UniProtKB/Swiss-Prot annotation:
Source organism phylogeny: Bacteria, Pseudomonadati, Pseudomonadota, Gammaproteobacteria, Enterobacterales
Annotated compartments: Cytoplasm
Entries under SUPFAM superfamilies matching the protein: S-adenosyl-L-methionine-dependent methyltransferases
Protein name: tRNA1(Val) (adenine(37)-N6)-methyltransferase
Any single Gene Ontology cellular-component annotation: cytoplasm
NCBIfam families, sorted: tRm6a37MtseTrmN
UniProt key word Nucleus: no
Entry similarity comment: Belongs to the methyltransferase superfamily. tRNA (adenine-N(6)-)-methyltransferase family.
Record keyword Methyltransferase present: yes
Native source species: Serratia proteamaculans (strain 568)
Purpose of the protein: Specifically methylates the adenine in position 37 of tRNA(1)(Val) (anticodon cmo5UAC).
PANTHER family found in the cross-reference section: TRNA1(VAL) (ADENINE(37)-N6)-METHYLTRANSFERASE
InterPro entries: DNA_methylase_N6_adenine_CS, SAM-dependent_MTases_sf, Small_mtfrase_dom, tRNA_Adenine-N(6)_MTase, tRNA_adenine-N6_MeTrfase
Keywords: Cytoplasm, Methyltransferase, S-adenosyl-L-methionine, Transferase, tRNA processing
Main location group: cytoplasm
């Protein structure tokens, strides 16, 4: 029997902005801290990119699929108005519990609800509710299992295939909504092709490389069910030759990273 729990956050922060200093056991942002010691997948550049880049439009209901530590949900809470509600769905109970704790510590504790359950079950009860859906999904095909089952589930597509992810998004999204993902570049190409086959349209695409002279290694996609009036495709190099961040990357993350 599938064990489920839903965490309703009920603590109100007394300040809209926090003056954070770096802490151990997680990642410190300008307005919030993300502990990730109980999560299989730690805070990384992929999640930060998606949280900072995802187009918001006029989204009132937001869903983060496979939320992990709650990183992307927290970033989107920072970027949106006080009336925007965010649901974060995470299959792993330890990660969901840590996401819950991270939300409680944040300034947006009334706006984020963490659900520890399978997205397929969640979709059955929340069909057609979300203007914006985001996901930093697993992408490795089944192979040699990790010793850590939670890490295996977070990295491999056995618990959430990309076809199943698209099907869930189709069920959950409103007709004019946007579904955003971040994936390795080659896997993202296949994901985009499959999405088009299923009736999705690419509204925005961001191709990411470590440096301007290196191959693209990540792609961020914003998909819609309706054809985009004007689809856009951009490139982003994260670092310069000397290892420092590019101006484009700094602009993207300036509201989040402590020292920019």
């Amino acid at each position: 029997m599938l064990r489920q729990f839903c965490i309703q956050v009920v603590i109100v922060s007394t300040q809209s902005k926090a003056n954070f200093t770096p802490r151990r056991g997680g990642f410190t942002f300008k307005q919030f801290f993300v502990a990730h010691d109980r999560c299989a997948m730690k805070v990384g550049t992929d999640g930060v990119l998606l949280g900072a880049w995802a187009p918001l439009a006029q989204a009132q209901r937001v869903l983060d699929i496979g939320s992990g530590s709650g990183l992307i949900a927290l970033m989107l809470a920072q970027r949106t108005a006080e009336n925007v509600q965010i649901d974060a769905v995470e299959l792993d109970e330890a990660a969901a519990a840590q996401a819950h704790d991270n939300v409680l510590e944040s300034p947006w504790s009334l706006r984020i609800q963490v659900h520890a359950q399978d997205i397929h079950h969640f979709a059955q009860h929340h069909a057609g509710q979300y203007d914006l859906i985001v996901s930093n999904p697993p992408y490795f095909e089944p192979a040699v299992a990790c010793r850590d089952q939670a890490r295996h589930n977070a990295r491999y597509t056995e618990t959430l295939t990309h076809d199943a992810l698209l099907a869930s998004a189709e069920q959950l999204i409103v007709p004019q909504g946007t579904f955003c993902v971040v994936l390795p570049h080659d896997i993202g190409e296949a994901f985009e092709t499959n999405a088009h086959r299923r009736g999705w349209h690419t509204a925005q695409r961001l191709n990411v490389s470590d440096r301007a002279d290196t191959p693209m290694h990540r792609v961020l996609l914003a998909l819609t069910r309706q054809p985009a009036e004007e689809a856009t495709e951009q490139k982003l190099a994260i670092k310069l030759a000397d290892g420092s961040y590019t101006d484009d990357f700094r602009r993207l993350i300036t509201d989040f990273y402590l020292f920019y």
